[in-house]
């Protein structure tokens, strides 16, 4: 007996975004399978999606097991354990596709992120404000820190090796601010004026990743490390410069994307 499937997607927002093309492929190739997606992280990047919005459930959704799961085949795709991934032949989206669809390595569409009008307007206001305050006509989103970054007694560290060094961040902001209005993407804010940066840097706080997606969608360029921002830029077709540290560019980024410049350190 063939059962409908429930795909459990875990991890951070980058993994959620990268799962989208594989789930779209599954729907295309299995039209009779009324599958659902159980989000062990967050549903935010499935929201508004023409297909996945109605299929996405939080793990704590009321009566999820009784109403759905007990009659379904439960699947927990893990892209990091896909052979093509850990041998640098597949990126994260392709690894999800192999784990979910088992069709081997193939080209996929970019993830679809659907933004609301409200999100777009909020992002436009952020971009317009920083351009007005700096007098610059071009904007750049800069995400220098990955998920493993932390601050202790005024020192910023990331033992995973994915983040920029703080001194490098300051020097890049000094250089970029000559040409761009900078929007700093990060939970740890730096007071750049104390480090000799004369131009104003926008440091939005307390906004969710969907608003960040909308902001990135309206900027001229993205600069960042191996973190969620580059996946958003790729999905939204924004040119990017990505600096890779302890991870492999073939896995975590898009070296074949013409609009991406990847610096493998």
Give each language-model segment a name.
Residues 17, 153-251, 257-260:
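Donor-binding and catalytic core of enzymes assembling or modifying cell-surface/extracellular glycoconjugates
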Residues 4-6, 139, 181, 221:
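Structural motif
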Residues 82-166:
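Mid-sequence helix-capping/hinge segment at a functional interface
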Residues 41, 143-146, 185-188:
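Short, well-ordered beta-to-alpha junction loops that form the rim of enzyme active sites
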Residues 1-93, 211-214, 229-231:
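Active-site and donor-binding regions of nucleotide-sugar-utilizing enzymes
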Residues 53-59, 202-205, 260-265:
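Short acidic-hydrophobic, aromatic-tinged amphipathic segments that line or gate anion-handling sites
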């Amino acid at each position: 007996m063939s059962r409908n499937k429930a795909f459990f997607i875990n991890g951070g927002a980058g993994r959620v975004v990268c799962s989208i093309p594989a789930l779209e492929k599954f729907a295309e190739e299995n039209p009779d399978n009324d599958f659902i997606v159980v989000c062990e992280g967050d549903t935010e990047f499935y929201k508004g999606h023409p297909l996945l919005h109605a299929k996405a459930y939080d793990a704590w959704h009321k009566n999820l097991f009784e109403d759905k799961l007990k009659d379904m085949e439960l699947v927990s795709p893990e892209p990091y354990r896909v052979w093509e991934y850990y041998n640098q032949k597949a990126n994260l989206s392709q690894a999800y596709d192999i784990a979910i669809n088992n069709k081997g390595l193939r080209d996929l569409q970019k993830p679809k992120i659907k933004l609301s009008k409200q999100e777009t307007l909020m992002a436009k206001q952020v971009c317009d404000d920083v351009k007005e305050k700096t007098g610059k006509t071009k904007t750049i989103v800069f995400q220098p820190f990955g998920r493993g970054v932390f601050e202790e007694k005024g020192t910023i560290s990331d033992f995973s090796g994915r983040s920029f060094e703080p001194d490098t961040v300051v020097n890049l902001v000094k250089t970029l601010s000559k040409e761009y209005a900078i929007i700093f993407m990060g939970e740890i804010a730096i007071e750049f004026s104390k480090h000799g940066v004369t131009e104003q840097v926008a440091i939005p706080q307390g906004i969710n990743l969907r608003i960040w997606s909308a902001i990135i969608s309206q900027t001229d360029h993205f600069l960042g490390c191996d973190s969620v921002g580059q996946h958003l830029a790729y999905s939204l077709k924004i040119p990017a410069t990505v600096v890779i540290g302890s991870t492999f560019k073939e896995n975590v980024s898009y070296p074949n994307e013409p609009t991406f410049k990847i610096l493998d350190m």
